[in-house]
């Protein structure tokens, strides 16, 4: 289990759950058709933590339970600055690509249903997105997670560059 998941159990945080997609799948065998269900679920605390999971089972309730357990196991932290993301980022997964840009207050979440659900439950209130390539919900969810994993907070950028957070925002004056 991930470190974040253990910290959440200790803190006793409450997470909101959302089912993005329930899809019926069929496997055709010589004995007939085997039906099963695939569920895509998101959990988040609307305060920078979100997880995405997929569950598969013969019955819908079992698939939902598996998807929610998977989502809780895969929780990641997202830096949220004044209700938006700190910088522009591109997330990629297979044939899907999602571009996310910070937006001014009052813009809202401009995104498709899958990306919107993930960013809402992460606590992002203003962001512009553009989905390119495949729009399969599972692939889009993974591309979104891959993108937000590459977000850095201002403090982390400052530490990597050995400057103060104020210098990251305003710029460093060149000597000479």
Swiss-Prot record:
Keywords: Ribonucleoprotein, Ribosomal protein, RNA-binding, rRNA-binding. The keyword Ribonucleoprotein applies. GO terms for molecular function: rRNA binding; structural constituent of ribosome. GO terms for cellular component: small ribosomal subunit. GO terms for biological process: translation. It comes from the Bacteria. Residues 15-78 form the S5 DRBM domain. Disulfide bonds: none annotated. The keyword rRNA-binding applies. Signal peptide: none annotated. With S4 and S12 plays an important role in translational accuracy. Located at the back of the 30S subunit body where it stabilizes the conformation of the head with respect to the body. The N-terminal domain interacts with the head of the 30S subunit; the C-terminal domain interacts with the body and contacts protein S4. The interaction surface between S4 and S5 is involved in control of translational fidelity. Belongs to the universal ribosomal protein uS5 family. Part of the 30S ribosomal subunit. Contacts proteins S4 and S8. This is Small ribosomal subunit protein uS5. It comes from Fervidobacterium nodosum (strain ATCC 35602 / DSM 5306 / Rt17-B1).
């Amino acid at each position: 289990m991930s470190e974040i998941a253990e910290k959440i159990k200790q803190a006793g945080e409450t997470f909101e759950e959302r089912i993005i997609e329930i899809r019926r799948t069929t496997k055709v065998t010589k004995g007939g058709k085997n039906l099963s269900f695939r569920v895509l679920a998101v959990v988040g605390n609307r305060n920078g933590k979100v997880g995405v999971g997929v569950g598969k089972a013969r019955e819908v309730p079992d698939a939902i339970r598996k998807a929610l357990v998977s989502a809780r196991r895969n929780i990641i932290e997202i830096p949220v600055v004044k209700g938006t993301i700190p910088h522009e980022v591109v997330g990629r997964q297979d044939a899907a690509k999602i571009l996310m840009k910070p937006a001014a207050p009052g813009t809202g979440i401009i995104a498709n249903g899958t990306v919107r659900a993930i960013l809402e439950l992460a606590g992002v209130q203003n962001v512009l997105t553009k989905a390119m390539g495949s729009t399969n919900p599972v692939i889009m969810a993974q591309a979104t997670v891959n993108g937000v994993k590459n977000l850095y907070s201002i403090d982390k950028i400052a530490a990597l560059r050995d400057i103060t957070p104020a210098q990251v925002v305003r710029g460093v004056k060149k000597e000479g």
